């Protein structure tokens, strides 16, 4: 079975990026991958997926990756990710050196002035198969900063469960002591 690693240093911060990554993880798992998270708390992932109503069947942890976020050793990250067929990495603007067969970086924010054009960054990008972003605006900034052609994948939207329509007359307005500001007194007469 193919193995995928989801790397997001922010699973303890509930936000749009976490939902995006967990939804992506669900899609990756449904494609037949054995799913691993670079995290140290399986219960936290379970709580998030339950809260966000995201279905993950069999989540595993790879705790060896988490300390590498801040270690600053590109070679250590490369070696640790080599055993995976796919790595999906939520970036903070930096580009890690990833070793999987297929490497995808998600940029949630339009990072600029972070040295995306530097030689070392461009060298690490040679190992990245695709950069994905969540909007055309983010794409325009990321493409210019990192000299790349990112792919826009919009965040998933949970369908609204509709109820039976209720017949209702709704009036929206405000109460003000001075009714003649907009000549409303004429409407009353």
Where in the sequence are the language-model features?
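A short, glycine/small-residue-rich beta-strand->loop->alpha-helix junction that serves as a flexible
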Residues: 7-22, 178-182
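Short amphipathic alpha-helix
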Residues: 17-28, 187
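Active-site donor-binding segments of glycosyltransferases and PAPS-dependent sulfotransferases
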Residues: 34-94
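Membrane-proximal helix-turn-helix segments that form the acceptor-binding/catalytic region
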Residues: 78, 111-133, 137-141, 145
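Active-site proximal beta-strand in glycosyltransferases
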Residues: 86-115, 132
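Conserved donor-binding/catalytic core segment of Leloir-type glycosyltransferases
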Residues: 132, 163-182, 188
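Carbohydrate-associated surface elements
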Residues: 137, 156, 165
């Amino acid at each position: 079975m193919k193995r995928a690693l989801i790397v997001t240093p922010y699973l303890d911060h509930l936000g749009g990026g976490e939902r995006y990554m967990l939804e992506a993880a669900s899609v990756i798992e449904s494609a037949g991958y054995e799913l691993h998270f670079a995290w140290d708390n399986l219960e936290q992932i379970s709580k998030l997926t339950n809260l966000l109503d995201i279905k993950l069947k069999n989540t595993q942890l790879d705790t060896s990756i988490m300390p590498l976020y801040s270690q600053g050793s590109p070679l250590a990250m490369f070696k640790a990710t080599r055993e995976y067929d796919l790595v999906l990495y939520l970036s903070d603007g930096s580009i890690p050196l990833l070793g999987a067969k297929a490497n995808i970086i998600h940029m949630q924010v339009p990072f600029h002035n972070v040295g995306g054009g530097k030689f070392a960054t461009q060298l690490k990008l040679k190992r990245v198969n695709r950069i994905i972003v969540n909007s055309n605006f983010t794409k325009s900034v990321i493409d210019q900063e990192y000299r790349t052609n990112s792919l826009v994948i919009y965040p998933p939207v949970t369908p609204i469960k509709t109820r039976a329509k209720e017949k209702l007359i709704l009036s929206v307005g405000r109460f003000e002591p001075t009714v003649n500001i907009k000549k409303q007194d004429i409407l009353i007469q």
